[in-house]
Curated annotation (Swiss-Prot):
A Gene Ontology cellular-component term: cytosol
The protein's name in its UniProt record: Small ribosomal subunit protein uS13
Keyword Ribonucleoprotein: yes
Organism superkingdom: Archaea
Gene3D superfamilies, per the entry: 1.10.8.50, 30s ribosomal protein s13, domain 2
């Protein structure tokens, strides 16, 4: 496999997309799935939308194809992909659907949690207190902190 790469002068061992270095030897669908915010199914859909082979190694793509892929992923709205595949639907402020990648996704999630805390919603209060948010049981599971053992009294020698 390494010999095949050496024969191709244009092969890129590292491809940078959305501020992340991707391994050029991995197939396109698996390399894109390494990005936070893009799963395997979305990566296959993006590859088909851009007329790329999902099983082709990402390092074998030409510079123009990689640039096209980079612009498509870093743009928040993907043309031709259904809204239900996006990871951020019905934004609170704009009401639009879009897909966020890497740091943008982390920042948006933190902003949403802080907004819930500020509004004093039920979920926000649970986030503030560090409790479970989605209705899970609390009696026996989800305990945090170290267990404090029982201290026994020292027995007196007779």
């Amino acid at each position: 496999m390494a010999e095949e790469n050496k024969n191709n002068e244009n092969f890129q061992y590292i491809v940078r997309i959305a501020n992340k270095d991707l391994n050029g030897e991995r197939p396109l669908k698996l390399a894109l799935a390494d990005l936070k915010g893009i799963g395997l199914r979305l990566s296959e859909t993006i590859a088909k939308k851009l007329d790329l082979d999902p099983d082709q190694r990402i390092g074998e793509l030409g510079e123009d194809k990689i640039e096209e892929l980079r612009k498509y992923i870093e743009g928040k709205v993907y043309d031709g992909i259904p809204y239900w595949m996006y990871n951020h639907r019905r934004d609170i402020t704009t009401g639009k659907d879009f897909n966020l990648v890497s740091n943008d996704l982390d920042l948006q999630i933190n902003d949403d949690i802080n907004l819930m805390k500020k509004m004093r919603s039920y979920k926000g209060i649970r986030h503030e207190r560090g409790l479970k948010v989605r209705g899970q049981r609390m009696r026996s599971n989800g305990r945090k902190g170290l267990a404090i053992g029982v201290v026994r009294k020292k027995e007196e020698k007779k």
